[in-house]
Amino acid sequence: DSIYILDEPENSLSAENQLKLKRFIEDSTRFYNCQFIISTHSPFLLKLMDAKIYDLDDTPVVTKKWTELSNVLVYYNFFKQYEEEFDKK
């Protein structure tokens, strides 16, 4: 029954390690009943199970789904633009 505050924990972590951190946080909330308050730009961490996301770029601050956040849409549009290159593999 603890609360942890993390400020951009994805800094210096590879995408693979961000996914490991995501799993660790989800397991911690499930098995140890703790809560996390996280400031992040990582689409991996924004996809945390049952996360309540506050978009601090909006005035007033609103809650959004992770797929509605502008930085996630930038990633999506970037990879969508090069989708054919992934299909060639």
Predicted segments with their positions:
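Walker B motif beta-strand of ABC-family P-loop ATPases
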Residues: 3-5
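Walker B catalytic acidic pair
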Residues: 7-9
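ABC ATPase nucleotide-binding domain "signature" loop
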Residues: 11-14
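C-terminal lobe/lid and adjacent interdomain/linker elements of RecA-like ASCE P-loop ATPase modules
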Residues: 16-37, 42-89
